[in-house]
């Protein structure tokens, strides 16, 4: 009997989750397949890649134009949220990475004498993706098996219940500042 694969089979799409825009790109690859029945070129959504803290792009997906943005760094996330709230921008899909450059630039990464290597690391993730024989999340045999044996099909009731979440606004907790005054935190 073959050994278990405790970490599973990875796809190139999974690898690029560590770079800003990677989660979006992986999702768009599979969304294109689900919408059209055929895979796009794996690099069709490369326009969203890069080190810029706020990237925008438009893609045609199944005859519709999809407006997307990917931001990294909390300052850029704040700018994006404010622009959305003020109606300055409109997107169909947004990715936010807290760390500049995505997880490749996160606090758990080694620091090289103060050099910022997130862009270089992100580039390496895309090289690993390009070399992977499985470039699409939906082609991962373990993901396919999970759907066949348990979830049913993408967007099935069970898959939706277990894999999707909804978000509604919540009131931020009260805080006490250095003068002892209580204040409410709220997005301005």
Predicted regions and their residues:
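Iron-sulfur (Fe-S) cluster-binding modules
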Residues: 1-188
């Amino acid at each position: 009997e073959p050994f278990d694969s405790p970490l599973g089979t990875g796809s190139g799409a999974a690898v690029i989750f560590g770079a800003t825009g990677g989660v979006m790109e992986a999702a768009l690859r599979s969304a294109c397949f689900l919408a059209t029945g055929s895979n796009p070129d794996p690099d069709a959504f490369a326009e969203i890649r890069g080190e810029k803290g706020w990237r925008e792009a438009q893609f045609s997906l199944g005859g519709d134009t999809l407006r997307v943005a990917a931001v990294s760094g909390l300052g850029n996330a704040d700018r994006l949220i404010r622009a959305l709230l003020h109606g300055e921008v409109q997107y169909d899909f947004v990715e936010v990475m807290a760390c500049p450059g995505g997880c490749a630039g996160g606090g758990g990464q080694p620091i090289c004498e103060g050099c910022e290597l997130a862009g270089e690391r992100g580039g390496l993730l895309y090289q690993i993706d390009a070399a992977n024989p499985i470039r699409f999340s939906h082609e991962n045999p373990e993901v396919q098996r999970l759907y066949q044996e348990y979830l049913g099909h993408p967007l099935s009731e069970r898959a939706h219940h277990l894999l999707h979440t909804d978000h509604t606004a919540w009131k931020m907790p009260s805080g006490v500042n250095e003068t002892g005054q209580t204040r409410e935190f709220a997005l301005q």
